[in-house]
Amino acid sequence: ESQMEQKNIEVQRKKGLNLMMKILITAIIPLLILVTFAGLAIRAVGVSVSDKLMQHELKTSIYAVNQTLSVISSGDWNVDGDQLYKGDYNISEHQDVLDAFKENTGLDVTLSWNTTRMATSLVRQDGSRETGTEIAADVYQTVKEKGSYFVSDNVIDGQKYYGYYEGLYNSDGSMAGLVFTGMASASVHEIYNDRLKKNIIFMVVLAIFACMFL
């Protein structure tokens, strides 16, 4: 009789465990599906928000660049050969100003005369500066007509960039060239994916805790 009772207890215990597993599985699967869809939704919305935030940050950084250049010299933009000047100040000889801006903000800066890059913190794979190359004519035209241009997939020397362009203007209102600020898309995506990963981990942990208290 004692053995029979023990078997019954064991059977009931197994039934209880099986029931608990069924409850957990029934609860966990929908939660995992919910977490997956929530993660995809966050990613979709996040990409859009990321673009808008980058556009705002790059636009703000151009204002900072312009203010810095105004302090350096109040003169108009001009060129002498392959040298870019603002007033009497030779920007091409002092590109360390742009390098310092990049070091402090993580953003690259380029100054162009018309569509030709004359001074930049952008460096090619061989270590030389990305000067003497051309900015697309349609970008220049868009800035001339609309005042600015934002792009999330600008390709420079084979690398994609988030970029924002505005005009470089002389005292008479004429547009002498362009000012560009940008960040490599890979760097932006790395920052965004890191935040997304943390959010998903938090949601998974939350789902596990929810299952434990069902």
Where are each of the predicted segments found?
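Non-catalytic regulatory/interaction regions at protein termini and inter-domain linkers
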Residues: E1-L17
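Membrane-proximal extracytoplasmic alpha-helices
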Residues: A41-D76, M183
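Short N-terminal helix-loop-first-beta-strand/juxtamembrane motif that initiates sensory/input modules
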Residues: H56, T60-I72, D96-M118, S148-V151
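Extracytoplasmic/periplasmic sensor domains and loops in membrane signaling proteins
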Residues: S92-G106, A119-I156
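Helix-start (N-cap) segments at beta->loop->alpha junctions
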Residues: G158, Y169-D172, F180-K197
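Glycine-rich acetyl-CoA-binding "A-motif" of GNAT/NAT acetyltransferases
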Residues: M175
